[in-house]
Amino acid sequence: MLGLPGEMQYVPGIHSPNEGPRPMTIQRKQTREVRIGKVRIGGANPVVVQSMTNTDTRDVEQTVEQIRQLQEAGCEIVRLAVLNEDAAWAIKPIRSQVSVPLVADIHFDHRLAVSALEAGVDALRINPGNIGTRAAVDRVVDAAKAHNAVIRIGVNSGSLETDLIDQYGGPTPEAMVESAFRHIRMLEDRNFGDIKVSLKSSSVSRCIEAYTLLSAKCDYPLHIGVTEAGTVLRGSIKSAVGLGVLLWQGIGDTLRVSLTSDPVAEMAVAWEILRSLGLRSRGPEIIACPTCGRCEIGLIALAEEVERRLEGETESFKVAVMGCVVNGPGEAREADLGIAGGRDKGIIFRKGEIVRTVKGGSNLLAAFMEELDTFLAHRRAERKDD
């Protein structure tokens, strides 16, 4: 019998409401494994986080500095724009100063791909819509073979081949997939299999459909992303929706969150997407209630200060900052460190045990920060002993 609208229904054989929380599991599609530098992608390897510098690649010092910032923030593969020969050869001194794998982003001129490989890049991204003739692609493939480099076939709906636009009536998901397969066949014809594929669009729904179609038809590793997603707020939302849907289906071996911002800002969003799906974790998870009329402590300031204090932490643990007695004690007990607010007081938990009760709202922030500092000191000491 159907219940009232909005009433939760128990479906036999699905999940009993008395079973408690069931761990979220995602069955990732098994793709071929390739290696970019020292980073293995595809196969049984975890989803890898990528980004792209927005510096002038010819400015070696500035580019190296941004790569280091990206790496510190959690970036595992970095792509560089190669607009001309000077940019291609700038990769050589850049390569000597950074350890993260580098990908050269190539458009229009296949000779730049060859130069970038000779300069030491680990992989290429070529755009089927503008890389040139079959002969040009063949030369790129031969150079990639010689340097043991991966080639990403990077299809973009904004630069799709004109004949496919005409054939499909626009940059449809089907046209994007056909573009990818056209170039996959070119590479396979030269016995080249170190291939990765991406199908990017600024349309979330088009991205999802294109990647879903492609994933069903090939087992090459996929780099997923929503291109030209926008500024931090809108871009983060579009990326979270698009990438989240794909990752939930098990699709995606590397990802990038594309934001109109400092590329370092992409890292936090990318890692939170992975954390939210239980795929990977980096740094602390902060749980905080949205506040309501029951909240009787200065929760917003407390949560913001906790977040600020934990910037730069890379170890994974859970902190709960809760404002009232409804959900607060339960969430705080489950966290490594947590606080549950009450009337002009707060109860601080560590690993489920009450370690401190603080009276007076003005003392709450200072007391919790003391406990947080103690907790972090213990964590660091444990790491040092290991």
UniProtKB/Swiss-Prot annotation:
> What does this protein's UniProt record list under function?
Converts 2C-methyl-D-erythritol 2,4-cyclodiphosphate (ME-2,4cPP) into 1-hydroxy-2-methyl-2-(E)-butenyl 4-diphosphate.
| Residues involved in [4Fe-4S] cluster binding | C289, C292, C324, E331
The scientific name of the source species is Nitratidesulfovibrio vulgaris (strain ATCC 29579 / DSM 644 / CCUG 34227 / NCIMB 8303 / VKM B-1760 / Hildenborough) (Desulfovibrio vulgaris)
InterPro entries associated with the record: Dihydropteroate_synth-like_sf, IspG_bac, IspG_bac-typ, NO2/SO3_Rdtase_4Fe4S_sf
Q: In which pathway does it act?
A: Isoprenoid biosynthesis; isopentenyl diphosphate biosynthesis via DXP pathway; isopentenyl diphosphate from 1-deoxy-D-xylulose 5-phosphate: step 5/6
| UniProt-listed PANTHER family | 4-HYDROXY-3-METHYLBUT-2-EN-1-YL DIPHOSPHATE SYNTHASE (PTHR30454), 4-HYDROXY-3-METHYLBUT-2-EN-1-YL DIPHOSPHATE SYNTHASE (FERREDOXIN), CHLOROPLASTIC (PTHR30454:SF0)
Q: Name one GO biological process term.
A: isopentenyl diphosphate biosynthetic process, methylerythritol 4-phosphate pathway
Name its co-factor(s): [4Fe-4S] cluster
The entry sums up its family as follows: Belongs to the IspG family.
Task: Name the EC number(s).
Answer: 1.17.7.3
Q: How is the cofactor bound?
A: Binds 1 [4Fe-4S] cluster.
Task: Cite the GO molecular-function annotations of the record.
Answer: 4 iron, 4 sulfur cluster binding; 4-hydroxy-3-methylbut-2-en-1-yl diphosphate synthase activity (ferredoxin); 4-hydroxy-3-methylbut-2-enyl-diphosphate synthase activity (flavodoxin); iron ion binding
Q: What class of enzyme is it?
A: oxidoreductase
Spell out the protein name for this chain: 4-hydroxy-3-methylbut-2-en-1-yl diphosphate synthase (flavodoxin)
Q: Which reaction does it catalyse?
A: (2E)-4-hydroxy-3-methylbut-2-enyl diphosphate + oxidized [flavodoxin] + H2O + 2 H(+) = 2-C-methyl-D-erythritol 2,4-cyclic diphosphate + reduced [flavodoxin]
What's the superkingdom here? Bacteria
Q: Has UniProt tagged this entry with the keyword Transcription?
A: no
Statement: the UniProt record of this protein carries the keyword rRNA-binding? no
Give UniProt keywords alphabetically. 4Fe-4S, Iron, Iron-sulfur, Isoprene biosynthesis, Metal-binding, Oxidoreductase
